Amino acid sequence: MCIRDRYGRYCYVQNKSESDSYKVKIIMKKMNISNLSKKNFSYLSDGEKQISLIARALIKKPRILILDEPVANLDYKSKFFVIDKVNELSKLNTKILCVTHDISTITKIYDRVIMLKDGKIIADGDQNMVINSENLKNLYGIRVEVTNNNGLWNIKRLIK
């Protein structure tokens, strides 16, 4: 089934309105995936699949978009493709709640970071306060060096 049909089917199941086909076109254009509309989902790269699934969720204009590990198991090219698209979304009126274990992909688009360990909050605040060597040692039990390069985090394990 091609991407456009997957969106159409989703809209149909959710009480498709007359304007849903137009919404699909607009969202695909906004997410820069119009060129994928006739491709079979199973032939897309993992990054393209992630973006198309995010786009599908946006059709109904949610106030909050929940992303669970949006860049897990992606190669670097696909990771940055997804990160760039999420960055674009952050400029719209959609709030984004992102769950991730990959701290290096937390970008400047997230204005609040909550760090959990065993279901308890161990740090909460803006990312410059939360993402630091002390909190990461507490979270993972290893010593690391943390740097931020233009909004992208670099975490390097330190030898004991």
Language-model features: locations:
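Conserved ABC ATPase "signature" region
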Residues: 19-36
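Conserved ABC ATPase signature
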Residues: 40-44
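Catalytic Walker B motif of ABC-type/P-loop ATPase nucleotide-binding domains
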Residues: 65-69
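H-loop/switch region of ABC-family ATPase nucleotide-binding domains
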Residues: 100-101
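A short, surface-exposed alpha-helical micro-motif characterized by mixed small hydrophobic
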Residues: 106-108
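ABC ATPase nucleotide-binding domains
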Residues: 139-160
